[in-house]
Swiss-Prot record:
Keyword terms, alphabetized: Ribonucleoprotein, Ribosomal protein
UniProt-listed PANTHER family: 30S RIBOSOMAL PROTEIN S16, SMALL RIBOSOMAL SUBUNIT PROTEIN BS16M
Family: Belongs to the bacterial ribosomal protein bS16 family.
PROSITE patterns, alphabetized: RIBOSOMAL_S16 (PS00732)
Gene Ontology molecular function, alphabetical: structural constituent of ribosome
InterPro entries: Ribosomal_bS16, Ribosomal_bS16_CS, Ribosomal_bS16_dom_sf
Protein's name according to its UniProt entry: Small ribosomal subunit protein bS16
A Pfam family that the UniProt record links to this protein: Ribosomal_S16
The gene coding this protein: rpsP
Ribosomal protein recorded as keyword: yes
GO BP field: translation
Keyword hit for Ribonucleoprotein: yes
Length: 114
C-alpha cells in the first residue's frame, strides 16, 4: 500500500478549505483516508497563523513510515521545518516569442526604419 500525504478538498463552493490527510494513493481525493493530520485554509492571508495547521508529531510519524507528500504538502512540511524544502522547479517561459517570430519582428523593424 503506497501512502500519500495530500490535500482533501472540503468547504463550500468558491470557498475552498482543505484537510491534510494520509491516504492510500489509489483512493479518491476526497474519499477514504487513514488519518487527518492538519488543515489548510487558502482564504486566510498568507501570514495568518491558522492558514496551515499541522500535527507535527503525526507528520513525522507518517514520513518515517514511508508516506510520500505531494508537492504542495511537501512545501507546507518544509516551511514548518519537519523535512527539507523540496527543490524549486523553474517555470518555463511559455509566452516568449519563438525564433521565427523574432526574425519577422526584426525584419519589420528594418523595413520601418528604411
Amino acid at each position: 500500500m503506497s501512502l500519500k500525504i495530500r490535500l482533501a478538498r472540503a468547504g463550500a463552493k468558491k470557498r475552498p478549505f482543505y484537510h491534510i490527510v494520509v491516504a492510500d494513493s489509489r483512493s479518491p481525493r476526497d474519499g477514504k483516508f487513514i488519518e487527518r493530520i492538519g488543515t489548510y485554509n487558502p482564504m486566510l492571508p498568507a501570514d495568518h497563523e491558522d492558514r496551515i495547521r499541522l500535527v507535527t508529531d503525526r507528520v513525522t510519524h507518517w514520513l518515517s513510515q514511508g508516506a510520500q507528500a505531494t508537492d504542495r504538502v511537501a512545501r507546507f512540511i518544509g516551511k514548518a521545518g519537519l523535512a527539507p524544502m523540496p527543490a524549486f522547479r523553474e517555470q518555463p517561459v511559455q509566452s516568449a516569442p519563438k525564433k521565427k517570430a523574432q526574425e519577422r519582428a526584426a525584419e519589420r523593424a528594418k523595413a520601418a526604419e528604411a
